Amino acid sequence: LGDVYKRQDAIHAIAKKHHLVVIEDAAHALGSEYKGKMIGSMSDMTTFSFHPVKPITTGEGGMIVTNDETLYKKLVLFRSHGITRDESQMTRNEGSWFYQQIDLGYNYRMTDIQCALGCTQMKKLDRFIARRREIVERYNEAFADCKNIVTPYQLPDTKSGWHLYIIQVKNKDRKEVFDALRAEGIGVNVHYIPVYYHPYYQEHGYKEVHCPVAEELYTHIISLPIFPKLTDEQQDEVIEKVKDLCIESI
């Protein structure tokens, strides 16, 4: 969540011991690093999201990366109705026009326009991530002396891409702070609501679930604006209003 990586080594050790495939959800972690390695280069498969609020976007959709040729071929089939034109996978070939459906698959292909947008965005990724890190440094420095604000912690051996910047508001009513910031036109949000709070999950056996740490965090968290085109002047305005609300009584 919000690109927080931990226990990677332990996960991969368990997978190796028990001959398991590691499928890594990196929807929030494009451009991040763990122990000097880019996220997406360590697991058997890694998924990324290109939703509009992510570090780069294709409008919607995402990508899966793998270095395993067998998994790659399965993924290519799965995204395209299980259809192939690869002669080595077909039972016969009647010509260059010929194809076969050899497995169950779906229409999970991006459009050409989305792909073109994604390729262009990917070239800008390093610049986007660098700017996000600058914004985080400015937030952290600005809030360092504010006892009512807990800034996000970056684990050792990690370099976050900072998809989100989530603070915890202490000794203040989170909803009042949130509403006051929204009233000032600042696009704050809350990421996320514990899943078992939703009616669907409560109706399917999770009504009595309690995760005290998640519940405690949920009552305090607010996500502040972070995106590459956020100017220093705009960020200073956010910082000023957040500090005013968290230092003084509302």
Predicted feature locations:
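PLP-dependent aminotransferase class I/II
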Residues: 6-17, 33, 69-250
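Hydrophobic "anchor" residues on beta-strands that sit immediately upstream
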Residues: 20-21
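Conserved active-site segment immediately N-terminal to the catalytic lysine
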Residues: 24-57, 73, 97-102
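Active-site PLP attachment segment
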Residues: 41-85, 112
